[in-house]
Amino acid sequence: MSDKQINLVIVTGMSGAGKTVAIQSFEDLGYFTVDNMPPALVPKFLELLERTNETQKVALVVDMRSRRFFKEINSILDHIELNANLKLRILFLDATDSELVSRYKETRRSHPLAADGRVLDGIRRERELLVPLKSMSQHVVNTTDLTPRQLRKVISDQFSSESDQASFRIEVMSFGFKYGLPLDADLVFDVRFLPNPYYQVALREQTGLDQAVFDYVMTHQESEAFYNHLLDLIVPILPAYQKEGKSVLTIAIGCTGGQHRSVAFAHRLAQDLTADWPLHESHRDINRRKETVNRS
């Protein structure tokens, strides 16, 4: 059995109050997540996690979709409280009756407790049954006036710690426009206006990771000026992206073929940012031209 404590968050609350967004937010924070776990399986699941010692952060959605929820939840909570290796917190999501009715009408889904099909009756019944659990919850969040992004921000603020800063990371990548834009890019910068090393015979087969190409790209006055503007733009906005709860920010820099100019710029940017942020550097098309030539 593990000697490390497992941080367990049970996500529950009113149906339609935002539990799907919540569990996705916990996943972005590095939690192992399970949606709609039958309450009876929770103790066995936690015992397995303790034995394997694979994760110390777990978030489970347990709600009215589990039909025996109210018969089993109290005994499960008692079991967890007796286990010294488990630190339990309950997140209860709520919203006004009118907002929940509006959300159900929008999605055209039926309420799990609306036996006669009347959503409002199901909401009222569920709210009554959840009173004891709500009173036990350490975190109660009313999502009536929250957008999904705002709810993610609330969860990040309440459940992330300083050690979770690595849950926000930066991906710096180079690419070639001739092969298409990266579909997952958040910020895209075009350096095709810079002098192209491709037209220097001695540099053509090298890449922006080679010192000769890097120096050729960066020694031009317009390159240095643009890079300084780029850095001045990116550095101040990174904390804002992190604050908004974004888990990965992908910065893509493109040139024509993705072999020279964009590689040099992406590499320099990664070098300058990596001291302050978790970062991964990649060059999508750096070998694309060579592969194409070899196939022809």
UniProtKB/Swiss-Prot annotation:
InterPro entries: P-loop_NTPase, RapZ-like, RapZ-like_N, RapZ_C. GTP binds at D63, M64, R65, S66. Keywords: ATP-binding, GTP-binding, Nucleotide-binding. Pfam families: PapZ_C, RapZ-like_N. ATP binds at G13, M14, S15, G16, A17, G18, K19, T20. GO terms for molecular function: ATP binding; GTP binding. The keyword Lyase does not apply. The keyword Oxidoreductase does not apply. Displays ATPase and GTPase activities. Belongs to the RapZ-like family. HAMAP family: RapZ_like. PANTHER family: RNASE ADAPTER PROTEIN RAPZ. This is Nucleotide-binding protein SZO_12220.
